[in-house]
Amino acid sequence: MLNRFSYSSNAWHNLRVDGPDADGIAVIVLARSQSRNALTLPMLTDMVQLLSAMDADDSVKCIVFTGEGPFFCSGVDLTEGFGEIGKTRDTHRDAGGKLALAIHNCRKPTIAAINGTAVGVGITMTLPMSIRIAAKTAKISFPFVRRGIVADAASSFYLPRLIGYGRALHLFTTGALYPAESGLLHGLFSETVNAASSTLPRALEVARDIAVNASQVGVYLTRDLVYRSPRSPEQAHLLESAALYTRYQSRDFEEGVQSFLEKRKPRFQDTMREQSGEGVLDRGDCVVGLAFKPKL
């Protein structure tokens, strides 16, 4: 495990980090309100580093992202550009995509508290997150075609899976700005709140519920099952069975049952570090974090 340190004491570029608190909740704030929280390459790089550190830190149980001021994020800062372009098509890697993959690969649940307008990578960076909560006043846009480019941050993978191909194509094709409650965005947000000021408090409520009541390892494996499950129910059944086999032998399973029977809050002890050491979360096979592939 990494030695615990104060994330807030590090000189992150236009990011403020609060926590983790006593319940294990860390908050990453996009703190560039004078530029509507537009992202720079150093900010994107720092978030990737933060996610890597928090992923390995057992004291972090849930990560919440939000924006400073009235905006969540207005996308990439176009005055600074998109960073260095690779020497060839095969070597170029989208910086927003690197962040999206860092979020996807982070084993801790992530929540977007979208307190205001989110545009471009400002919204696509939230697609790999576990939960998105938005203010009803927020405006959302995927404006890539209006800038002469294409979707970024692996959003061509995530968005259709979240809201369906028809709505995703409409949003991508028009590049227009839509209110958070638009029918075109149906399914993108698990909750919307009336006031922008209520977005972060509600996200923290959800994060605390997860941190206090859910097994970290159980949450991670379940999310991996959702994203990596095969196409047939039979194959999904085999993978779920393999994952259940490992969890039935865990301390968290014993504690989950015992706390339910005793009508008390669970005190889960399994950590990512311990499970990784046993090979349960070995990503080598790329099959729901299991260290083996069941025979189909």
From Swiss-Prot:
Extra remark: Gene clusters encoding host-selective toxins (HSTs) are localized on conditionally dispensable chromosomes (CDCs), also called supernumerary chromosomes, where they are present in multiple copies. The CDCs are not essential for saprophytic growth but controls host-selective pathogenicity.
Family as reported in the entry's similarity comment: Belongs to the enoyl-CoA hydratase/isomerase family.
First-level EC class: lyase
EC number(s) per entry: 4.2.1.17
Domain of life: Eukaryota
Gene disruption phenotype: Abolishes the production of AF-toxins and their precuror 9,10-epoxy-8-hydroxy-9-methyl-decatrienoic acid (EDA); and impairs the pathogenicity. Does not affect growth rate of cultures, sporulation, and spore germination.
GO molecular function: enoyl-CoA hydratase activity
Catalytic activity: a (3S)-3-hydroxyacyl-CoA = a (2E)-enoyl-CoA + H2O; a 4-saturated-(3S)-3-hydroxyacyl-CoA = a (3E)-enoyl-CoA + H2O
Places the protein is found: Peroxisome
GO cellular component: peroxisome
Xref: Gene3D superfamilies: 2-enoyl-CoA Hydratase, Chain A, domain 1, Lyase 2-enoyl-coa Hydratase, Chain A, domain 2
Gene name, Swiss-Prot/TrEMBL: AFT3-1
Keyword DNA-binding (UniProt): no
Keyword Lyase: yes
Segments carrying motif Peroxisomal targeting signal type 1: 294-296
UniProt protein name: Enoyl-CoA hydratase AFT3-1
Organism placement in taxonomy: Eukaryota, Fungi, Dikarya, Ascomycota, Pezizomycotina
Pathway field: Mycotoxin biosynthesis
Principal subcellular localization: other
Function recorded in the entry: Enoyl-CoA hydratase; part of the gene clusters that mediate the biosynthesis of the host-selective toxins (HSTs) AF-toxins responsible for Alternaria black spot of strawberry disease by the strawberry pathotype. AF-toxin I and III are valine derivatives of 2,3-dyhydroxy-isovaleric acid and 2-hydroxy-isovaleric acid respectively, while AF II is an isoleucine derivative of 2-hydroxy-valeric acid. These derivatives are bound to a 9,10-epoxy-8-hydroxy-9-methyl-decatrienoic acid (EDA) moiety.
Keywords from the named record: Lyase, Peroxisome, Virulence
Protein's organism: Alternaria alternata (Alternaria rot fungus)
